[in-house]
């Protein structure tokens, strides 16, 4: 009989220990337990081959992006001028999906009839060209030029009426110094007059200082955390940035979640709106909390 109970408990023990040792972020609850940063929404793992949201898409990824578009307006409650709303997107490390989300947040806003500019400002490691077709010239070429107009480097996305892109351009030898130039300030001053929204794909904050250099241009910062990739302990980085106010008006987006975990009506409402849909688990999963 003892051997029977040992055999019965052994698999549960293995599962429990495995769960105990797994420190990766899984759900919204993991983010909220480890940070005090407002939670804007989560984006389920995409099952579509399309890299950019389409107007008729009804996938869980597309719906989550529409909810994030709605929730974004709460971040602009204190904005008093009529200039473009500037949304900066960053993460702790590369490969957390910030470029994917930058492009799709810009596309989702453009589908609502707003004039949107996407800027590639991760000039050390540009990735926009992996998702959409853009020229090799762009922001850095403009910043190093003396007689070029910014309009020469901005392109319109063919399948959108109001979606424009300023690519990163060639990788410069001195990215930090380039981003510190007054020409960047003048550029944003000009662009804010011509668009409704500006979405900026910036560098990961865990690696370089580039994002902090341009942070003053942002109305809000979306901090992307990728589920099953980032360690919970790494959340101390955005938490410190939030409390030290190094990135203005921060909110977290949890990317690449399992669609059965936390996705449902109102799942993305990080400001107390809607009802969280909880996944129903078997008794043994509830017992061991995995």
Language-model-detected regions and their locations in the chain:
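Inter-motif core of Ras-like GTPase G domains
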Residues: 207-228
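Well-ordered beta-strand positions
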Residues: 197, 220-223, 251
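Conserved dinucleotide-binding and phosphotransfer motif residues
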Residues: 112-113, 194, 217
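Residue-level preference for the first positions of well-ordered beta-strands
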Residues: 86-88, 117, 163-165, 197-199
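Nucleotide-state-sensitive switch-loop elements of NTP-binding domains
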Residues: 143-171
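Short boundary/hinge segments that flank catalytic cores
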Residues: 2-117, 121-140, 151, 173, ...
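Phosphate-binding/switch loop-helix module in NTP-utilizing enzymes
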Residues: 168-208
């Amino acid at each position: 009989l003892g051997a029977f109970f040992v055999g019965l408990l052994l698999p549960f023990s293995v599962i429990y220990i495995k769960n105990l040792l797994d420190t990766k972020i899984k759900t919204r609850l993991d983010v909220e337990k480890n940070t005090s940063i407002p939670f804007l929404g989560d984006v389920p793992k995409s099952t579509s081959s399309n890299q950019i949201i389409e107007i008729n898409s009804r996938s869980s990824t597309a719906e989550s992006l529409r909810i994030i578009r709605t929730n974004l307006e709460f971040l602009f409650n204190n904005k008093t001028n009529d200039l473009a709303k500037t949304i900066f997107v960053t993460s702790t490390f590369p490969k957390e999906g910030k470029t994917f989300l930058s492009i799709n947040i810009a596309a989702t806003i453009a589908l609502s009839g707003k004039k949107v500019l996407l800027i590639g400002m991760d000039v050390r490691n540009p990735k926009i060209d992996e998702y959409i077709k853009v020229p090799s010239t762009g922001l850095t070429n403009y910043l190093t030029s003396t007689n070029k107009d910014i309009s020469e480097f901005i392109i319109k996305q063919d399948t959108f009426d109001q979606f424009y892109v300023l690519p990163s351009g060639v990788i410069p030898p001195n990215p930090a110094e380039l981003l510190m130039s007054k020409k960047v300030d003048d550029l944003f001053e000009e662009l804010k007059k011509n668009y409704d929204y500006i979405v900026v794909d910036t560098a990961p904050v865990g690696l370089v200082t580039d994002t902090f250099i341009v942070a003053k241009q942002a109305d809000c910062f979306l901090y992307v955390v990728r589920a099953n990739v980032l360690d919970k302990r790494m959340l101390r980085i955005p938490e410190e940035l939030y409390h030290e106010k190094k990135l203005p008006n921060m909110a977290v987006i949890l990317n690449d979640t399992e669609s059965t975990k936390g996705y449902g009506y109102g799942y993305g409402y990080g400001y107390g709106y809607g009802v969280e849909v909880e996944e129903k688990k078997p008794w043994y999963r509830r017992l061991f909390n995995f």
